[in-house]
From Swiss-Prot:
HAMAP family tied to this protein: AcpS
Species this chain originates from: Candida parapsilosis (strain CDC 317 / ATCC MYA-4646) (Yeast)
UniProt entry tagged with the keyword Phosphoprotein: yes
One GO term of the biological process aspect: mitotic nuclear membrane biogenesis
Family membership noted in the UniProt record: Belongs to the thiolase-like superfamily. Fungal fatty acid synthetase subunit alpha family.
EC number, UniProt record: 2.3.1.86, 1.1.1.100, 2.3.1.41
Additional free-text comment from the UniProt record: It can potentially be a fungicidal target. Inhibition of FAS2 by cerulenin impeds the growth of wild-type and heterozygous strains.
The protein's name: Fatty acid synthase subunit alpha
Single GO cellular component term: fatty acid synthase complex
Length: 1884
């Protein structure tokens, strides 16, 4: 054939082939087989723009024909027209000239360290690195090479995937690398298209190496649009200012000799190794380029050479510069510049030396000031200088006055302590609590007590009986004292010092109860009696006789003297020899008539009839028949007494005044002392001080007190708050302020604050009492060491105390209300020594007693000096505690802090106050200490004796121990040594505890069988990601205020502090926890101690941590501002494309020009152009609730590519979802499809804002032209989070609904989820909410004044964790937070079938809007509509609320349904006959009966469900008499009184907390909640902050945990509940957790901006279990237990292996089955190879529709046509037979039947089936009935050897059958989990 013809035929063939390919289906696989196998083609040529088919042919040859070709010795060539033209046309390459010999490159071994160094540099690009050395000479150039397509493709793909080059294999295709992410794939293909101009067909399926080969032939070797743009962005965003691409290229050329092509390659390599942040200097940039060049060299297989060290000297014409000439030139230039500067200065009239002159003057002034400061410090000292700094701030004042709330809280705490057996008897502490409650009694509190006491279930045990008895008595007490003033009455035990020395030589001190003095009443008597040391010194009888003798003898005669001498001698002998006269007594004492003792005996003390009597006597006011003053012994000074000034000017004991004081003390001890309407200032009342005890007494007596503290902190304010919460009486107020009594400014500011009007920021008080007890110790300072501290102490205790009194005097406005000042005097007038100026300070105060007379302030201040005796345990005296017992043995008295406070408070009685107004009063409270001579020596001896005894015993103990060890061995003490047992962690992950069925039935016995469980929605799983980790760890902190060991371990794991290791560690096998940083083992017992502080610091509400928010620092919040530039700017360099864009924007205000060396462009912005310049402002929202630092999705097992792809909020949602599933016992989500169709699993979770990080990227980062992923838009959608959950975990095809309800989103989600389940659209739904925290939202919330200002809070002395304070007086806005919360909800019926844990029942949910308005965030009360209920003039409640009534109606309806079902089954024979006539020969009776029976059963179930729904679930709906809330509770036989807790939205805003409290209160009131039964208010946001979308989900989780534990967590930040909330009697605001005896139901309310109100009510699952029969419940309990064990194992493995989250890589069905599964609602998975998958058999299965019971029944019915005429069909519901009724069973079943049924797998079904068989048999007999109540015991159903039922008739039944002609009865029984059916046939 001629060549021309061949060419024409070839052309025709090619055309036809192309036409065929375009017009017909592609059959390329078959085509390849034809030419490769049939024709053995060796040369295959593709004609086209790229080697698409050629590539496929190459892969086919490699995979299919490799061995085939080898066998036939075929050498195939696959060529492409566009790529292999030379091979196709056989065009040889021209011969190349031999290359010149090149220097040897460095060896690979030598370059390896350089590469390693470069890699190290790349990991820390931002670190400060020394700039590379400057080239000493020219570098040898490397032959240039254009960029290869392989490198370009590799870089573009790796950069898009955010991976290093070595993590992207070239052997994989793009489709494989993107892992199914179509968006990323499209981005890569788009970038390749831009870069190369065109792409081959299906490039995503081609391996990168092949794709590179296809591109290489047409690739020019220059960078395209995409790579140029990326490099330009790298240079502008990560290089230091001024370091442009031109600089980079020049550096690479000079440093390494790289040409333009290789420079491009290095810059491409840099794209995959971008620094984390902008490099700081040019040196850093060059170091970075060095690293990138080395990476490129390693990749390209070349060696980089450095500049030649001798290059500078090797040049022939190198110039040499004379250094002297250079220096002269530089000096001349500087001189010229200086002359020009001076000339310009003269012209501008500027003095160049002005600054220097001013500096000299400032320096001189500074020197003078420094000298003065040095002098001042030298005189006063450093301690004094620091000590006088003022600290007072009225902003930091804390006011406590919410006694009304704490009274109810304390009462409940005591109540539950009694019920739980913690308080079993009435001790002093209990009586004290009762007194405090009585002090706060009001009508509301009495109603509160009455409700709990009257409804106390005493049948529960003795503790409940005790609680009722004591409660009734306390109620009576409170009623008696209503309207009376509160009193301070201390009923504590009196204690004394006791010091012992143990056998081991330890000195042990304790406060021991005094048995002889048990009450303060007896204590006062003891004080009045004094002691041996306080007796007045009197002469003896002998001395009196001697004086008489001398006086008489002077006047007597001589004889008389002799006679008198004789009588005197005889008297002396009588006195000395008498046993009746004590010679040491005075004459007066010897002749005195003894008086009766007032000391109560032990018998008197124990004579009370019962504990109740002691409480009952509390309100009584006892009249004192014989005052204690009458018992003061003559010539004895009481331990406590009042002194008056004698004529000599000395202070001496005054019996009259002392009597007044002691009688007042006695009255205070017996009847109490009130301080109502008293305004008091107390300083020096720190913990453990006398002042603190005084303060406690003042507020318990109703005083209004301002107390100061010099150590202001959260710990200190909590101390005072706790004191007030416990002791604050009605009408009392406690105000705490920071105050330094050493500062004059603070003294003035404090008094100004007290007296200023409230409008001026003050209190507007007028002080009645001043108790200035502030002091600091000066131990160890003698007169030779009076230092700075001593002087400062003197200033506090004297100077500024006087200033304080003077300031009060100056502000006193009336002379009729003087302030009583209790001066803290001391008996220590240098007695102890070495106490600095302490004694001098105290003595100097005594001058005020004289100045009261001599100065003009006597009508405004009164003086009462209190000489304070030895008080044990105070800061000043605690070191002397051990010798106090020895001191008391001398006959004096030391005091406890309570005793001394009682003594001082006794000075505030009206009688003493009146005395003070007449004259200054000196009260000696020294206990007789002043009568001890040489006190210092005696105390020293006591101390030395104790120390010596201790030393001796210690030495003896040591010696004995040594001897024992020598004799008995070293381990002799092992059995006696104290061992501290530290338990190991036990992480349980428990499911809710299930009670026994009998306990369940006691809860609600009438609920069994009442509800349609498919219309009951339950929570089976819940979880969260929040500031406190997860739901478990958050609950520990919320309920207990601290982490358990297990909680600490979990938090440490979450925060990346520890990880689990199983393998070799440092060469040894180790399994356990290790520190994540040091890789060292950590014992689980030590984790809490080691990491807890760091955990607490970096979790919860805290200062914003910039590393969590991409560097966002609110202290430097960045914003931009537009400015017009005033002069031309310096030019800068960028790419051509970017330069043109600048020109396009700025027009003639911008000049651009090309830079010839690099091809880059120079840009110059001209005057008049507008620029946006960044600025930073100090933003005051510095605090937020943040995810724990170190939280990482990788810890849970989420893949890296997913983390890089999605918004951070999506990660929170994924983790919360998988934890929620595990909480539900679901370890594989595909298990759902074993029970439900894929269309029945939905997701209704939502968010307020969605992916805010993605939104930020879309708007802010994109606007700033920062790198942003191209598919960022999809991550911003609110429904994307749900989409990821489905794509990675569920693979469901059910409803997806995405609520957006601002802060109410989560509860709205629950509402939608419930509706979705109840409507039948789904059976399992994921609900919840989620939101992130970002600076944009934070700023806008601040602009709305919705959030609290951290700066303002800091000024008020608040710590970050205190800044969210719902319900408090000082609440000031909500605190933002971030996180997610998810619940798994499903129908109760499904939950029971699956055996998943049921955490709570969702009894009700609702949403509501509010009224007309103009404010979107304004709070409203629309949600009150859940309590909508018409009352009108209706007198009687609806019978529908009575469960017994509803049960009766349901029973009737079920009987009707059973009758209908039986009749339908009976009619089936006739129906089959008619159908046979209709369908003819094709008719199958068996199939017809099966299908129709199934339909009847299904219809019966539907009718039963509707009946239960009508009378159980939905009876209240649309009934105006029954509120939705009331009806939802009544469904479970609960009332409005059974809502135990209301979880408040509680945002800590003024408006919300009041509005929400009013709403809940109105709701309870309208629905008739009992008075005195407030709900516990839970305000979770004090702990977590406000996460917006997740808020309701976290609250719901907390509500579930409340139901499970019975613990009601308190609002620990509620330091003082707002007075305005007192009006809401139906809400209690606890500040601490209270363990109750069970919570039945919890209400959760949520409110969102945009008129969103929502409420959900959860009920304890016990009320659901009460609906079940015993068999169903016990079967469920078994399956839950098994699931719990499985989940327990999974959770432990998940934590130790970081595999909690396991992403699904495929759906549970193959692609081929997708549509089949979708279209078959009965398709279910089966478990194959440990996986749940759909199979062909499971889709459209013949067995999936007709149930076993229908088959069995149909089979029995089909035999009716062939059998006898007596037929009986009976249907019984399993739920209707009460097998717990023993009487019923014994009456209707034989013992054998009972035994058989009880031993069956399902006793409920077995009994029901047997009963149905009995009924069917009776019907088959056709005999007359004996009535509905007749026993069926005579019809016995027995089982044969095969288990088949047989009928045995006995007695009357047998006789009736015989009379009817019945010979035998055959019966068939079938049942499922819903009903049992029996068909009986009689044989005649």
């Amino acid at each position: 054939m001629k060549p021309e013809i061949e060419q024409e035929l070839s052309h025709t063939l090619l055309t036809e082939l192309l036409a065929y390919q375009f017009a017909s289906p592609v059959r390329w696989i078959e085509t390849q087989d034809v030419f490769l196998k049939q024709h053995n083609t060796e040369r295959v040529i593709e004609i086209g723009p790229s080697p698409t088919l050629a590539g496929m042919a190459s892969r086919t040859i490699k995979a299919k024909y490799q061995s085939y070709d080898a066998a036939l010795s075929l050498q195939r060539q696959v060529l492409c027209y566009s790529k292999d033209a030379k091979e196709i046309y056989y065009t040889p390459d021209p011969a190349e000239p031999p290359a010149a010999e090149e220097p040897k490159a460095e060896t690979g071994k030598e370059s390896a360290p350089a590469a390693s160094a470069a890699a190290a540099a790349a990991t820390q690009p931002a670190a400060a690195v020394a700039p590379p050395p400057q080239s000493a000479g020219p570098v040898e150039s490397i032959p240039d090479e254009p960029v290869k397509a392989s490198l370009l493709i590799h870089v573009l793909v790796a950069q898009k995937l955010k991976k290093p080059l070595d993590a992207v294999p070239m052997s994989k295709a793009i489709k494989d690398l993107v892992n199914g992410k179509s968006t990323v794939q499209n981005e890569i293909l788009g970038d390749l298209g831009k870069e190369f101009g065109s792409t081959p067909e299906k490039p995503e399926e081609t391996p990168l190496e092949e794709l590179a080969e296809q591109f290489q032939d047409t690739f020019s070797g220059s960078l395209g649009k995409t790579s140029t743009s990326l490099i330009g962005r790298l240079m502008s965003s990560k290089m230091p200012g001024g370091f442009s691409i031109t600089n980079a290229r020049k550096y690479l050329e000079s440093r390494f000799g790289l040409g333009p092509g290789r420079q491009d390659s290095v810059l491409l390599t840099a794209l995959c190794n971008e620094p984390a942040s902008r490099l700081g200097s040019e040196g850093d940039a060059k170091s970075f380029l060095d690293t990138m060049a080395q990476k490129y060299a390693s990749h390209a297989g070349i060696s980089l050479s450095s500049p030649s060290a001798g290059g500078a000297s090797s040049g022939a014409g190198a110039a040499v510069v004379d250094s002297a000439a250079l220096d002269a030139l530089i000096a001349e230039n500087k001189k010229l510049a200086r002359q020009q500067l001076e000339t310009l200065a003269r012209y501008l009239q500027v003095d160049l030396t002005k600054g220097e002159k001013a500096f000299i003057k400032e320096k001189e002034a500074t020197t003078v000031l420094q000298q003065e400061l040095d002098l001042w410090e030298a005189e006063h000292g450093e301690f004094y200088a620091k000590g006088i700094k003022p600290v007072f701030s009225p902003l930091k004042s804390r006011t406590y006055d919410s006694y009304w709330n704490w009274a109810r809280q304390d009462l409940l705490s005591m109540w539950f302590d009694i019920l739980f057996g913690k308080l079993t008897s009435v001790d002093r502490e209990t009586i004290n609590q009762c007194i405090q409650i009585m002090n706060r009694a009001n009508p509301t509190l009495i109603k509160f007590m009455q409700y709990h006491v009257e409804l106390c279930p005493t049948y529960r045990g003795e503790t409940y009986k005790l609680g009722k008895r004591l409660g009734e008595q306390l109620i009576e007490n409170c009623k008696q004292i209503l309207g009376q003033s509160p009193v301070y009455k201390d009923v504590s035990r009196i204690t004394g010092p006791k010091t012992t020395v143990s056998a081991k030589g330890d000195i042990v001190y304790e406060e021991a109860n005094k048995e002889s003095v048990r009450k303060f009443e007896q204590y006062v008597f003891e004080m009045a009696q004094g002691g041996s040391m306080t007796k007045m010194k009197q002469s003896s009888i002998q001395e009196d006789l001697a004086r008489v003798y001398k006086a008489i003898s002077k006047q007597a005669s001589r004889d008389s003297k002799l006679e008198l001498q004789k009588v005197y001698d005889q008297l002396l002998k009588v006195v000395e020899g008498s046993t009746e006269i004590e010679t040491e007594q005075t004459t007066q004492d010897a002749l005195a008539i003894p008086t009766g003792s007032n000391t109560p005996t032990e018998e008197d003390e124990l004579s009370t009839a019962s504990d109740d009597d002691e409480i009952a006597s509390l309100p009584d006011k006892t009249s004192i028949a014989q005052p204690v003053s009458s018992t003061i012994p003559n010539k004895t000074i009481p331990f406590l007494h009042i002194q008056s000034k004698s004529e000599s000017g000395n202070w001496e004991y005054d019996r009259k005044l002392s009597s007044i004081y002691l009688d007042g003390l006695e009255s205070a001890a017996i009847n109490g002392l009130t301080f109502k309407d008293k305004y008091v200032l107390v300083t020096g009342a720190g913990a453990g001080s006398i002042g603190a005890e005084i303060l406690q007494g003042l507020i318990s007596g109703g005083a209004k007190v301002i107390v100061t503290t010099s150590r202001y902190s959260k710990k200190v304010t909590e101390y005072y708050q706790n004191m007030y919460a416990r002791y604050g009486a009605a009408g009392s107020t406690l105000i705490v302020v920071p105050f330094n009594q050493g500062s004059k400014q603070d003294v003035d500011a404090l008094v100004e604050y007290i007296y200023n009007d409230q409008k001026k920021g003050g209190l507007g008080w007028d002080l009645d009492v001043i108790i200035p007890f502030a002091a600091i110790p000066e131990n160890g300072n003698g007169i030779d060491n009076i230092d700075s501290k001593s002087e400062f102490a003197h200033r506090i205790m004297l100077t500024n105390l006087l200033r304080l009194l003077g300031a009060v005097k100056a502000r006193k406005t009336t002379d009729t209300r003087p302030a009583q000042c209790i001066l803290p005097l001391s008996p220590n007038h240098g007695t102890f020594g070495f106490d600095g100026l302490y004694s001098e300070s105290k003595i100097s105060l005594e001058t005020l007693f004289n100045r009261w007379y001599s100065e003009d302030w006597g009508t405004k201040l009164t003086i009462c000096g209190a000489i304070i005796g030895w008080t044990r345990g105070t800061g000043l005296m605690s070191a002397n505690n051990i010798i106090a017992e020895g001191i008391e043995k001398l006959g004096v008295r030391t005091f406890s802090q309570k005793e001394m406070a009682f003594n001082i408070l006794g000075l505030l009685t009206p009688e003493i106050v009146n005395l003070c107004q007449e004259e200054p009063v000196m009260a000696d409270l020294n206990g007789g200490l002043q009568f001890i001579d040489n006190l210092k020596e005696f105390t020293s001896k006591l101390r030395n004796d104790l120390t010596e005894t201790a030393d001796i015993r210690r030495a003896v103990s040591i010696e004995s121990a040594i001897e024992q060890k020598v004799v008995n061995g070293d381990n002799v003490d092992s059995n006696y040594n104290k061992v501290t047992v530290r338990p190991r962690a036990n992480m349980k992950f428990d499911f809710p505890t299930l009670k026994s069925y009998d306990e369940i039935k006691q809860i609600a016995p009438d609920l069994e069988g009442m509800l349609d469980l498919e219309n009951v929605v339950v929570v089976t799983g819940f979880a969260e990601v929040g500031p406190w980790g997860n739901a478990r760890t958050r609950w520990e902190m919320e309920s207990k205020g601290e982490f358990s060991l297990e909680g600490a371990i979990e938090m440490a794991w979450i925060m990346g502090m520890i990880k689990y290791h199983n393998g070799n560690l440092k060469g040894k096998p180790y399994s356990g926890w290790i520190d994540a940083k040091t890789q060292t083992p950590v014992d689980d017992k030590d984790i809490k101690a080691k990491y807890e502080e760091e955990i607490l610091e970096h979790s919860g509400i805290r200062l914003i941590e910039p590393e969590l928010f991409n560097g966002y620092d609110p202290k430097k919040k960045q914003m931009i501002q537009e400015v017009v530039i005033q002069h031309d700017l310096e030019p800068f360099e960028c790419s051509k494309e970017t330069a043109e864009q600048y020109k396009h924007e700025h027009g003639d205000k911008c000049e651009i020009s090309e830079i010839e060396e690099s091809g880059e462009y120079s840009v110059r912005i001209l005057k008049g152009a507008t620029l946006f310049i960044p600025k930073a402002l100090r933003f005051d929202r510095l605090v937020a609730g943040q995810i724990p630092t170190g939280w990482d999705a990788r810890t849970y097992g989420i893949p890296e590519d997913t983390i890089n792809q999605v918004d951070p909020i999506t990660l929170y949602v994924l983790v919360a979802t998988v934890e929620a599933l595990l909480s539900a016992g679901i370890t594989d989500p595909y298990e759902f499809y074993k029970y439900v169709h894929v269309s029945e699993v939905g997701n209704c979770s939502g968010s307020g804002m969605g992916g805010v990080s993605a939104l930020r990227g879309m708007f802010k980062d994109r606007y700033a032209d920062k790198p942003v992923q191209n598919d960022i838009l999809q991550e911003s959608f609110i429904n994307t989070m749900s989409a990821w959950v489905n794509m990675l975990l569920l693979s469901a095809s059910g409803p997806i609904k995405t609520p957006v309800g601002a802060c109410a989103t989560a509860v709205e989600s629950v509402d939608i989820g419930i509706e979705t389940i109840l409507s039948g659209k789904a059976k399992v739904v994921m609900v919840g909410g989620y939101d992130d925290f970002q600076e944009e939202g934070s700023y806008e919330f601040a602009n709305m004044n919705a959030t609290s200002s951290a700066i303002d809070e800091f000024k008020h002395g608040r710590t970050p964790k205190e800044m969210s304070r719902p319900t408090t007086t000082t609440r000031n806005g909500f605190m933002e937070a971030q996180g997610s919360g998810i619940q798994v909800i499903m129908s109760a019926d499904l939950a029971l079938k699956m055996g998943v844990p049921i955490h709570a029942v969702l009894a009700m949910s609702a949403t509501a809007t509010d009224k007309i308005g103009r404010s979107v965030p304004a709070p409203g009360k629309g949600i009150l509509t859940t309590a909508r209920e018409h009352h009108g003039n209706l007198k009687y409640p609806s019978p529908l609320l009575n469960v017994k009534y509803r049960k009766r109606q349901l029973s009737k309806r079920l009987d009707q349904i059973k009758s209908w079902e039986s009749s339908e089954l009976n009619y089936l024979q006739e129906e089959a006959h008619l159908a046979k006539e209709e369908f003819g020969e094709e008719f199958s009776e068996a199939e017809f009966l099966r299908e129709r029976t199934e339909e009847i059963y299904r219809e019966s179930k539907r009718q039963v469900a509707d009946a239960k729904k009508q009378w159980g679930n939905a009876f209240y709906k649309s009934d105006p008499r029954i509120a939705p809330l009331r009806g939802a509770l009544a469904t479970f036989n609960l009332t409005i009184d059974d809502i135990g807790v209301a979880s408040f939205h509680g945002t800590s805003t003024v408006a919300n907390d009041k509005n929400e409290s009013a709403t809940i209160d109105s709701m309870m009131k309208h629905l008739g909640r009992s008075e005195g039964n407030p709900v516990f208010g839970v305000f979770q946001k004090y702990l977590t902050g406000h996460p917006k979308g997740a808020a309701g989900a976290w609250m719901l989780n907390g509500a579930i945990q409340i139901l499970e534990s019975g613990i009601v967590p308190g609002n620990r930040n509620a330091d003082n509940v707002d007075k305005v909330l007192e009006q809401y009697e139906y809400v209690l605001y606890p500040s601490r957790s209270i363990q109750t005896d069970g919570i039945k139901a919890v209400s959760v309310t949520s409110f969102g901006f945009g008129q969103k109100g929502a409420q959900a009510v959860v009920v304890h699952p016990d009320y659901l279990y009460a609906v079940l029969d015993r068999s169903t419940y016990e079967d469920y309990a078994k399956r839950v237990t098994a699931r719990n064990k499985k989940t327990y194992r999974y959770m432990h493995n998940a934590i130790t292996r970081n595999t909690m989250f396991v992403a699904k890589d495929k759906a549970p069905y193959s692609d081929e089955l997708t549509m089949d599964v979708y279209l078959d609602p009965l398709a279910r998975v089966s478990k194959t190879k440990n996986e749940f998958v759909f199979t062909k058999k499971s889709v459209q299965s013949d067995k999936s529709y007709v149930s076993n019971i229908a088959n069995s029944t149909a089979k029995a019915l089909s035999s009716l046509n062939k059998s006898s005429k007596g037929v009986g069909v009976d249907v019984e519901l399993l739920s209707e037979l009460n097998i717990d009724n023993e009487t019923f069973l014994e009456r209707n079943f034989t013992p054998e039947e009972i035994k058989y049924c009880q031993n069956s797998a399902n006793p409920q079904a077995s009994f029901t089936g047997t009963w149905s068989a009995k009924e069917a048999t009776f019907k088959a007999l056709g005999v007359s009935s004996q009535g509905g109540g007749a026993s069926l015991k005579e019809i016995e159903i027995v089982r044969d050897g095969n288990g088949a039922p047989q009928v045995v008739l006995n007695d009357n039944a047998k006789a009736a059958a015989k009379a009817a002609g019945v010979k035998n009865v055959n019966v068939s029984i079938s049942h499922d989990d819903f009903q049992a059916t029996a068909v009986a046939l009689s044989e005649f």
